[in-house]
Amino acid sequence: MHFTTVTANPCIDRTIQVDSVNLGHSHRIQKTICDFSGKGINVSLALTQLGMPVKSVCLSHSDGEAANFFKQKDMDAELIPVPGNVRINIKLFETSTGCMTEFNEKGTPLERETAADVIRAVKNVLPTTSVLILGGSVPPGFPDDFYYELGKCAQEYDVPFILDASGSLLVNGMEAAPVLIKPNEEEYYATFGVHPSITQEFCASYRQILMEHNIAYGAVSLGEKGALLVTPEAAWYSEPVSVDVKGVQGAGDSMVSGFAYAIAKQCTQGDQLLKTAVSCAHASLELPGTQMCPWQAWKKDSRLHLLSSSVRFSMGQI
């Protein structure tokens, strides 16, 4: 197995921990944590910590943050030099409630040719890739069909790809038939105009989207309410598990790493896919800042329920 991730808009997550946020007032900071981040980077780190070989295709700004990170972590990366500094994202984490408020920069504007450079770099490593993971925002200047073009490249090499994005990046990317998509609750609503819910009606609407685009799996991370996995045949729901939440921004990316691992292992059972992914997410929640699941994630237990199946719940019964 060998994984490839793409990070077109890396960042530094500056997590500021406070007891609670009271708008218009001053606050005493409990702790500040800085992590080099980005969806692809985070998935690469999680898979590396799970003992998997990963190639990270990542933009590298003039400030050298990307180069320093991959050297420090001793991770394999194809770095594409670009001008400017990496963007800074501010994360206000309330330790009393576990709630996080985010302020994310857009990133340095770049030319479309840089997007073409990324696509060429990915094509070079696809012959040895088991699963390609695409996700996150793109910098100003990149086309909305960026993930679609990468997905078409993956198709040429018969490489399954996972897409974790939102808006036009997700809508366009779905046309290349990813094996799995994983928007979170907010991203799903922003993209499809429907609030995710743990109901058969929602699963039916999600199932229709998957079938129209030949997508095998559609996940939705629901934060403290758990997670859903929908296929054309069935749907599974994972209950939230009580954990000591110290950081939330790495959980979704850890979940993607779990899906990627299971898919590379040729797991096709929805309940096992979701259990693996949720286990990774739970482990990340117990770490402060933007940190990924360690190997011990596999020891976590997830309570899963078959929410719907083709026998109990099919399109013809709606």
What function would you assign to each model-found segment?
Residues 1-24:
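Positively charged, low-complexity intrinsically disordered leader regions
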Residues 28-86:
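Substrate-binding N-lobe of the ribokinase-like
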Residues 45, 90-92, 226-230:
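Short beta-strand scaffold segments in enzyme catalytic cores
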Residues 102-104, 129-136, 164, 182-185:
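Short beta-strands and strand-loop turn motifs
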Residues 145-233:
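Conserved phosphate/ATP/ADP-binding segment of small-molecule kinases
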Residues 213-224, 239-303:
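Conserved post-catalytic alpha-helical subdomain immediately downstream of the catalytic base
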